[in-house]
């Protein structure tokens, strides 16, 4: 990986310009173990993953204007392109794959903010986004001898919001967003959808030394037209949100928090209209979320300058949940609705910093999640849908977590990170043949920053997946084993 900060220059007292870019290339030909059966005594062989090359390029530039403490402007331009091979699932005696995927994306966005007075603040933004994707499978057994699909999408977006501070501890805001999305492709009888979206939100917030309350209502209006076939239809939805945070002890940063949120999610164009993926019969996803939690933070002493912990329990009721299943490769998934899902879980996080010496700092953090996500669509065991009643939904582990440890010194920085995921199922039916083992990943890195002439330079070396295990996040798609990555960052 090579990353370079090309420019960050203050033009005058009001304007600053910046630009940076990144390029990455990898053949991705990593070894893995192919199992000839599910039993431990079955044969295995060492193979090499093929058609896994990746090349990416990213560039962006920004212009920042600070006219005063109460007036700012931002402009950003972005470009990204990539090409990658799409390896097939690891099946016996057939690892041939020549499928390729090319992506391009560019956008320009701007933001303006003006504080007219202590009471009134105005903010607006605009964005134009263009994306292109080309998918090629040269081995398709059809009259053309291949599948070659190209998709083009554009978005035009405008938003405006106003904030009114009625009192020092009471404020209200009104915001509205409008967007037009279009999609086209090189396919016969393609839908050519156009989506008109209008979202308006009214929100209020009250806060004092011991209590914070926020509430909002979001009105969503969606109109969608197509030139061919069926569309996702038109939708009208009003979704509320309310949250509260209570601080019972004046001298301690201990808080009790709660929120309720109603969520409405419309399927994306990719979900609906991609030939290999899309399902125009997808229904919008609706969810009701309830959350209650505790947070605590403290500066204990000079040796322990920072300590924090959070724990949250949540309950979600989701109807028409949009889920995806992988098929022949990681770019082609099958989309469908799952009638009703009940989710219960606990999230816990913790972090602390130790300062044993003035210029040496140790940072530790971690998080843990327990999540029960059950299909409760149909309780009749005599039906096909009833076979998965109260089963964990596919690719959703009950337990997962991660952790980080780092040491900062004036000479070199060292860090260690890990993540783990418990057992999952590749289908909604929780039976032995659908089970996937859990996995863990451990990585370490060292880095150093220094100045050379007028540049700020940093160098880092990472050893990824130090246990060298080809674990699978998606069944039959093994991840790379141990690898080393070096990064050079030069900032002018």
What are these model-predicted stretches?
Residues 20-22, 26, 119-137, 249, ...:
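Membrane-embedded beta-barrel scaffold of Gram-negative outer-membrane proteins
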Residues 26-30, 37-39, 46-56, 64-122, ...:
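Flexible loop and strand-edge segments within Gram-negative outer membrane beta-barrel domains
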Residues 26-32, 314, 319-320, 362, ...:
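C-terminal beta-signal and adjacent terminal beta-strands/loops
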Residues 23-27, 79-83, 128-132, 178-184, ...:
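Transmembrane beta-strands of outer-membrane beta-barrel pores
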Residues 168, 210, 308-317, 334-428, ...:
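Gram-negative outer-membrane beta-barrel transporters
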Residues 83, 223-228, 232-238, 246-291, ...:
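Surface-exposed extracellular loop regions of Gram-negative outer-membrane beta-barrel proteins
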Residues 13-14, 69-72, 115-121, 165-171, ...:
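Short loop/turn motifs that connect adjacent beta-strands in outer-membrane beta-barrel proteins
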Residues 3-42, 60-64, 311:
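Predominantly transmembrane beta-strands of Gram-negative outer membrane beta-barrel pores used
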């Amino acid at each position: 990986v090579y990353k370079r900060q090309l420019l960050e220059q203050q033009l005058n007292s009001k304007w600053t310009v910046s630009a940076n870019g990144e390029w990455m290339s990898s053949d991705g030909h990593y070894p893995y173990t192919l199992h000839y059966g599910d039993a431990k005594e079955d044969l295995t062989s060492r193979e090499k993953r093929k058609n896994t090359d990746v090349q990416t390029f990213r560039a962006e530039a920004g212009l920042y204007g600070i006219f005063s403490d109460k007036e700012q402007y931002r402009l950003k331009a972005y470009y990204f392109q990539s090409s990658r091979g799409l390896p097939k699932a690891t099946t016996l005696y057939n690892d041939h794959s020549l499928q390729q995927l090319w992506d391009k994306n560019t956008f320009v966005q701007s933001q303006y903010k003006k504080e007219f007075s202590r009471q009134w603040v105005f903010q607006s933004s605009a964005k134009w986004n263009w994306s292109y994707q080309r998918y090629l499978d040269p081995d398709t057994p059809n009259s053309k001898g291949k599948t070659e699909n190209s998709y083009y999408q554009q978005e035009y977006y405008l938003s405006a919001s106003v904030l009114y501070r009625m009192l020092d501890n009471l404020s209200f805001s009104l915001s509205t967003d409008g967007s037009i999305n279009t999609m086209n492709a090189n396919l016969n009888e393609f839908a050519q959808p156009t989506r008109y979206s209008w979202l308006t939100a009214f929100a209020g917030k009250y806060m004092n030394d011991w209590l914070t309350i926020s509430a909002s209502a979001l009105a969503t209006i969606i109109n969608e037209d197509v030139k061919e076939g069926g569309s996702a239809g038109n939708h009208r939805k009003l979704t509320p949100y309310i949250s509260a945070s209570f601080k019972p002890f004046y001298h301690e940063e201990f808080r009790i928090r709660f929120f309720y949120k109603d969520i409405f999610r419309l399927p994306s164009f990719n979900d609906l209209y991609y030939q290999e993926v899309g399902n125009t019969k997808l229904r919008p996803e609706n969810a009701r979320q309830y959350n209650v939690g505790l947070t605590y933070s403290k500066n204990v002493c000079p040796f322990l300058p920072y300590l924090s912990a959070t724990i949250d329990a949540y309950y979600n009721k989701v109807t028409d949940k949009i889920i995806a299943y992988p098929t022949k490769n990681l770019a082609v998934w099958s989309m469908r609705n799952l009638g009703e899902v009940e989710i219960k879980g606990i999230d816990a996080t913790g972090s602390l910093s130790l300062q044993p010496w003035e210029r040496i700092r140790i940072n530790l953090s971690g998080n843990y999640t327990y999540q029960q996500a059950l299909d409760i669509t149909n309780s009749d065991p005599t039906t096909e849908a009833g076979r998965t009643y109260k089963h964990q939904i596919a690719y959703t582990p009950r337990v997962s977590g991660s952790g980080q440890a780092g040491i900062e010194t004036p000479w070199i920085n060292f860090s260690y990170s890990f993540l783990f995921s418990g057992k999952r199922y590749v289908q909604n039916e929780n039976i032995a043949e659908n089970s996937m083992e859990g996995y863990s990943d451990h990585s370490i890195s060292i880095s150093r920053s220094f100045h050379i002439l007028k540049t700020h330079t940093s160098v880092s070396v990472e050893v990824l997946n130090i246990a060298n295990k080809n674990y699978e996040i998606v069944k039959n798609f093994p991840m790379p084993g141990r690898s080393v990555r070096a990064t050079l960052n030069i900032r002018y």
